[in-house]
């Protein structure tokens, strides 16, 4: 069967840069889906995307759809005809479903069967529908119309190229008749570009100053930006999302170095970087010490004969934005940071939970409580908590919301606050996402935990629990943040007590009944997914969860110990024994004696197990006190032999009540040793 390369390119007005990659990948996926559904084989597929075009190249596409046959089974023959041989409604309905007369149905077998051979169609006749369906299925939140046309797309369409080998596919899609005429660069080559063949697509456009391959443009921008930064004795900040966006804005990238006045460096560099990246799409430069240089890199979409004009234009555009940041910074510093707290009394945190000022006061007290328990400075934590939301009322954060916390840090330093207090104002928002940076200071950790617990308790306390994908107060992220800080920074904090403190701080604003348990359950539930991502089995998590440890650090240490225990050869047998013991003890009527009495032993294996348990108990007590859970479980693994011997030789439910009760007590001691770490009966 013959094969030809296939190219489709849809030309448009400038596409949304942040959506370009998504649109391109969806376009490719849609065409691939259509080709597979039609049974059309090909060798490779590639998507191209630029500001004014989406294109897909399919190599070695079969030019003819293969023939196929269909076989449909109908009702059983006895159900298809009555006693007189007349067709029933079942038979007639099957024929109607197949679109044929009953006489065309095969009636020779046990069931009615309809068979049909379908000749394959030329690929050229199938491609218009495949392309059109793919475009219609693109993830476009809001489509637009243009002119007097009824067609809708993300942007007005301008041209359409569709080639199968040298053949133009005759069709009209989104108001554009297919041909082989594309367009070059809007300024360097505004006239049409003839695409000779699908394989010459990239070369034909390159000659017209268009790099259709987004990966090629991205590589050029990245490499050239790095070279220019090195010449400036700096390092470029190139966030992946910004690089993708800039790549989607240009067809012929030309990075250029621009500069701004050094006086702007007195403004917090985070504000300057934010405005240059978010508003102007510039790559900022840092020196060897991580300080902002008074230079930046812009990526032009034109190879100018006089690049200095482009440089001057960008410098002129950025100056007012930097001037605004400078003005806000100077205005805010005219008063102490704490003075902004008064404004927060009129800013609602949550209608039922009071103002942001109220929240800051609660966070201050809770942060001091937490700091005292994790080895931090309680007075610093209290101060940082009180100032934690002040910068929300500043001009700087009003203009640059991303500066919350960062602005507070600079203003606190300006006011002479201790550095740990200033740092905590920024660290309170950490971690800002999955895998993001954690607070470096204990003061920051205390405020961050306090802020998150206050939000969790408050929102839970008024019944606004997250449901499904809806989590307007980011409670899941808050819970994960608390856990990450405590576990990864090795901070031992009893969350039972901390949550209770937070509940009391709200007073009558929340429904306290059951609130502690609900919040703690929600927090520790987040660990399940965390451990699954780390390859820790659910059973391991549940074995520790059954004990309800209040410390996230302690919880994690137990989980790691159980995970290591499961790799021991004795683990499976001991887990099974624990499950057996748990079942036995759960069926005991009345209470199990707390003391084991040797006088009721009538089997040597009872003495052996009792002795082994006593020795193990003495060994693991100091280990448990030191939270050496790995060592504790490793020592308990040695109980397998006496445990197996006991169950092989001893009937637990003896007829003598005293002997039976004593054996229950012995097994309860055994189970209690393991419960010092986890309920390993759940590992089966």
UniProtKB/Swiss-Prot annotation:
Transmembrane portions of the chain: none
Principal subcellular localization: cytoplasm
EC identifiers of the protein: 6.1.1.14
InterPro entries documented for this protein: DALR_anticod-bd, Gly-tRNA-synth_bsu, Gly-tRNA-synth_heterodimer
Catalysed reaction equations from the record: tRNA(Gly) + glycine + ATP = glycyl-tRNA(Gly) + AMP + diphosphate
Any single GO CC term annotated in Swiss-Prot or TrEMBL for this entry: cytosol
Coiled-coil segments: none
Keyword Aminoacyl-tRNA synthetase belongs to the record: yes
GO MF entries: arginine-tRNA ligase activity; ATP binding; glycine-tRNA ligase activity
Localization annotation: Cytoplasm
Superkingdom of origin: Bacteria
Keywords, ordered alphabetically: Aminoacyl-tRNA synthetase, ATP-binding, Cytoplasm, Ligase, Nucleotide-binding, Protein biosynthesis
Pfam families from the UniProt entry: DALR_1 (PF05746), tRNA_synt_2f (PF02092)
Annotated GO biological process: arginyl-tRNA aminoacylation; glycyl-tRNA aminoacylation
Family recorded in the similarity comment: Belongs to the class-II aminoacyl-tRNA synthetase family.
PANTHER family: GLYCINE--TRNA LIGASE, CHLOROPLASTIC_MITOCHONDRIAL 2, GLYCYL-TRNA SYNTHETASE
Protein's name in the database: Glycine--tRNA ligase beta subunit
Organism field: Pseudomonas fluorescens (strain Pf0-1)
């Amino acid at each position: 069967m013959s094969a030809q390369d296939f190219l489709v390119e849809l030309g448009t007005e400038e596409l949304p840069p942040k959506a370009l990659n998504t649109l391109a990948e969806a376009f490719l996926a849609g065409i691939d889906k259509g080709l597979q559904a039609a049974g059309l084989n090909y060798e490779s597929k590639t998507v191209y995307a630029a500001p004014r075009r989406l294109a897909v190249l399919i190599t070695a596409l079969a030019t003819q759809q293969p023939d196929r046959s269909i076989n449909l089974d109908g009702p059983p023959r006895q159900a298809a005809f009555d006693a007189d041989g007349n067709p029933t409604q079942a038979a007639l309905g099957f024929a109607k479903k197949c679109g044929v007369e009953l006489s065309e149905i095969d009636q020779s077998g046990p069931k009615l069967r309809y068979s049909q051979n379908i000749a394959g169609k030329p690929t050229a006749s199938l491609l218009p529908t495949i392309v059109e369906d793919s475009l219609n299925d693109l993830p476009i939140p809001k489509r637009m119309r243009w002119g007097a046309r009824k067609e809708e797309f993300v942007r007005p369409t301008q041209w359409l190229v569709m080639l199968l080998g040298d053949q133009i596919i005759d069709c009209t899609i989104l108001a554009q008749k297919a041909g082989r005429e594309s367009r070059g660069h809007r300024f360097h080559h505004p006239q049409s570009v003839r695409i000779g063949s699908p394989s010459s697509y990239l070369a034909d456009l390159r000659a017209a100053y268009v790099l259709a391959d987004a990966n090629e443009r991205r590589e050029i921008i990245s490499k050239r930006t790095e070279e220019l930064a090195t010449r400036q004795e700096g390092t470029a900040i190139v966030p992946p999302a910004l690089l993708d966006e800039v790549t989607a804005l240009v067809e012929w990238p030309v990075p250029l170095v621009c500069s701004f006045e050094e006086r702007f460096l007195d403004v917090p560099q985070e504000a300057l970087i934010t405005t240059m990246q978010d508003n102007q799409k510039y790559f900022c430069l840092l020196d060897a010490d991580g300080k902002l240089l008074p230079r930046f890199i812009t990526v032009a979409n034109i190879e100018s004969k006089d690049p200095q004009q482009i440089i001057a234009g960008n410098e002129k555009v950025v100056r007012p934005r930097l001037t605004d940041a400078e003005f806000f910074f100077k205005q805010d510093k005219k008063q102490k940071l704490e003075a902004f707290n008064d404004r927060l009394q009129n800013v609602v945190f949550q209608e039922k939970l009071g103002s942001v000022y109220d929240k800051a006061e609660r966070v201050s007290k809770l942060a001091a409580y937490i700091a005292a328990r994790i080895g931090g400075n309680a007075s610093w934590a209290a101060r940082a908590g009180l100032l934690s939301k002040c910068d929300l009322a500043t001009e700087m954060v009003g203009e640059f919301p991303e500066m919350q916390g960062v602005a507070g840090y600079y203003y606190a330093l300006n006011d002479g606050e201790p550095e740990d207090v200033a740092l905590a104002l920024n660290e309170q928002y950490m971690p800002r996402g999955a895998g993001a940076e954690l607070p470096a200071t204990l003061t920051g950790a205390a405020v961050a935990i306090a802020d998150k617990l206050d939000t969790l308790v408050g929102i839970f306390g008024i019944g606004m629990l997250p449901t499904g994908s809806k989590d307007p107060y980011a409670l899941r992220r808050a819970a994960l943040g608390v856990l990450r800080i405590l576990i990864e920074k090795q901070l031992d904090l009893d969350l039972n007590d901390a949550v209770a403190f937070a509940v009391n701080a709200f007073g009558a604003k929340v429904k306290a009944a059951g609130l502690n348990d609900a919040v703690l359950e929600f927090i520790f539930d987040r660990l399940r997914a965390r451990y699954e991502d780390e390859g820790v089995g659910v059973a391991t998590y549940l074995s520790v969860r059954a004990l309800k440890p209040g410390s996230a650090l302690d919880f994690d240490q137990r989980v790691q110990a159980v995970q290591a225990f499961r790799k021991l050869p004795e683990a499976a047998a001991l887990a099974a024994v624990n499950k057996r013991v748990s079942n036995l003890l759960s069926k005991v009527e009345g209470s199990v004696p707390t003391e084991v009495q040797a006088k009721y032993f009538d089997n040597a294996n009872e003495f052996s197990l009792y002795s082994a348990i006593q020795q193990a108990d003495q060994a693991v007590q100091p280990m448990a006190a030191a939270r050496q859970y790995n060592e504790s479980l490793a020592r308990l693994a040695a109980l397998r032999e006496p445990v197996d011997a006991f169950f092989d030789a001893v009937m637990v439910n003896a007829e003598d009540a005293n002997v039976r009760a004593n054996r229950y007590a012995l097994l309860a001691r055994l189970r209690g040793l393991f419960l010092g770490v986890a309920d390993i009966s759940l590992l089966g």
